[in-house]
Amino acid sequence: MDVARTRFVRKQAPIPPYALDVRGLKMSYGNTEVLRGVDLKVAPGEVVALLGPNGAGKTTTIEILEGLRCRTGGKVLVLGTDPECGDERWQARIGMVLQSWGDHRRWSVRTLLAHLTAHYSGLVPSPRGVQNVDQLLEAVGLTAQAHRRIGQLSGGQRRRLDVAIGLVGNPELIFLDEPTTGFDPEARAAFHELIRSIARQRSTAMVLTTHDLTEAELLADSVAILVSGRIVARGTTETIARKHSWGTRVSWREHERLYSKTVSESVPFVRDLSLTKPHIT
């Protein structure tokens, strides 16, 4: 991804009732149906975790919502706009936390962020205004590393830089796809605190994908459980458990082992979800 990709001038639009409104989202690759009617609503300022095992369709869903992949069916409203595939004009008000500094390893952290803020400042990317470099550095805890080359940062520091890049346009909605993959426990805890702090201080809506229930509970106001391309439950883990207390359970295996804390341990309502029981009602 080009960190300096063009963003377009956009007039301030009325605030939509939902930061994200997804209805019947479908995605197929040939005859293989990956998403089979995903429905998801995210209110302004709400943090939602899209929770599910690998292969459930989490990354595909996020890529469609970011405009990086074309859907085959359904309706998507991102901040009130139904984006056309490949059209970046609507992306001026969203943030994507992904590794987007690959060609700039020799740049300092400050140089890269200054370049981005200068690029976006004249384009009015958000009605909330563009962040300055010092604000970004402070927000992600990289003030002390401001003059360090990106290639010299630790893995956790680089991930913080990813967040800073996602915050440049002061977005109203941020997408994070498996944000702590490969982190050790200490780095994971620090990153969790960073995301919670940003959510509290900025009232920014966030959608993050994870297969870790503990992470979802720590970061999100609510979870949406995605299994085999469908949202099978939505709410806090407590409300989901109360609503679906009829005794089935969700669990999944990966690499022949169960996660230390899977959905089955905290949300005892689905057991071995299959195509014969795709929905919970």
Locate predicted features.
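Helix-to-loop junction immediately C-terminal to a conserved catalytic motif
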Residues: 66
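Conserved ABC transporter NBD signature motif
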Residues: 74-85, 90
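Conserved ABC ATPase "signature" region
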Residues: 114, 118, 125-145
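Conserved ABC ATPase signature
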Residues: 149-153
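Catalytic Walker B motif of ABC-type/P-loop ATPase nucleotide-binding domains
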Residues: 174-177
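ABC transporter nucleotide-binding domain
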Residues: 192-279
